[in-house]
Design a protein with these regions (language model features):
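Preference for short coil/turn "hinge" residues that link or interrupt alpha-helices
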Residues: 23, 35-38, 65-67, 74-77, ...
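Structural recognition of the beta-strand scaffold that forms the well-ordered cores
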Residues: 28-31, 38-42, 53, 62-64, ...
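A penicillin-recognizing enzyme superfamily signal
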Residues: 28, 79-172
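Mid-domain, small-residue-enriched loop/turn segments at the edges of structured enzyme/sensor domains
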Residues: 2-14, 46-88
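A generic secondary-structure signal for well-formed alpha-helical elements
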Residues: 45, 49, 54-58, 62, ...
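Conserved catalytic neighborhood of penicillin-recognizing serine enzymes
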Residues: 1-50, 111-136, 140
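Solvent-exposed loop/turn segments at secondary-structure junctions
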Residues: 24, 35-37, 48, 61, ...
Length: 172
């Protein structure tokens, strides 16, 4: 029901909550973890299309109740997602757009070199390579100068290692 309250709000550095609905720059919104832009995008692109993309392309295990705007745009999912499920979804952007379930063991060979086990080789194109490249740049910017700067890593020789990340806020 309509309450007249602006939604969703964003945590602000001053410690309170604020509404930032006029901003339309996705690059900056992701960098600063603004909730309003995903909500606007969800409305614009269509919640069913986003739900289908999340479940079919990224392999997220969502329930029917998650087809609403709050779950899809700000992550207020009915049951949440497991860390493995989330890793699988984000791996798409590090795999050139291909989805594959995370695995630790890719193959096992016997002492004489005979293949005993081979796994984790099913890959599906989830997004095109250009999209995965753009998403990587967006997520790297979150670490470079956004809300995840604490995750920056510098090698012993001073080289800055590119890290992609995403932060979120919750009251739970």
């Amino acid at each position: 029901p309509a309450t007249g309250k602006l939604w969703p709000t964003n945590y602000s550095s001053g410690g309170g909550m604020s509404y930032t609905g006029s901003m339309k720059n996705v690059y900056y919104a992701l960098q600063k973890s603004y909730n309003t832009i995903p909500a606007l995008l969800c409305k614009e692109l269509g919640r069913i299309e986003i739900y289908n993309f999340a479940t079919n392309n990224l392999g997220l295990e969502l329930v029917q109740n998650d087809q609403d705007y709050a779950p899809l745009s700000v992550g207020a999912l009915t049951y949440g997602v497991s860390i493995t499920n989330l890793v699988n979804a984000y791996m798409v952007y590090g795999n050139g757009g291909y989805y594959s379930k995370a695995h630790i063991i890719s193959k096992v060979e016997s002492g004489d070199g005979t293949l005993v086990y081979s796994g984790g080789t099913d890959y599906n194109q989830a997004v095109d390579e250009e999209t995965s490249t753009v998403m990587n740049k967006l997520l790297q910017n979150v670490v470079k100068q956004g809300t995840a700067t604490a995750a920056k890593i510098t090698a012993s020789d001073g080289t800055k290692i590119p890290i992609a990340g995403k932060t979120g806020t919750t009251s739970d």
